[in-house]
Every structure is written in structure tokens, then in C-alpha cells.
Amino acid sequence: MLEKAKIDRINELSKKKKAGTLTATEKVEQDKLRKEYIKSFRTHMKGTIENTTIIDPNGTDVTPHKVKQLRKNKH
């Protein structure tokens, strides 16, 4: 995941934006940090989904076909 310092900076810039004191340079920095955060989040979420197996109450594997294909293509 993203470093704590970067997440703290995202939050700091967000507060400045709400207060109306965000400069143009800080806006560029905020956009860059947000994109980096979203990329990191998506990467981790994809890994979580790929490693999840869904079992119904009868004990049958009902993991969606698309997830099974992602696993197969990964290896």
C-alpha cells in the first residue's frame, strides 16, 4: 500500500482544498498522489479478488468464471 507519509499528505492537501487555500502547485501534487493511491489500491484489490474462493452452503465452489480465468492466466 501507499506510504503513510503520502496518505497524510493527500489528507493535508484535501483539507487545504476544502479551506480554499490550495495553490496550483499543490493541486498538481494532489492529483499525482491521488493517481498513485488509486493505482496502489486497484493493484491490492485485484490481488485480493484473485485469491478469493467463494463456497456456497453445500460446499460447492461458486467462484465466478472470470476470477478463475484471472488465476489461470496469472500462472
From Swiss-Prot:
Subcellular location field: Cytoplasm
Composition skew (Basic residues), residue ranges: 65-75
Assigned keywords, A-Z: Cytoplasm
Gene Ontology CC terms: cytoplasm
Protein name in UniProt: UPF0291 protein LMOf2365_1322
Major subcellular site: cytoplasm
Keyword Cytoplasm set for record: yes
Species, as recorded: Listeria monocytogenes serotype 4b (strain F2365)
Record family assignment: Belongs to the UPF0291 family.
Stretch list, region Disordered: 56-75
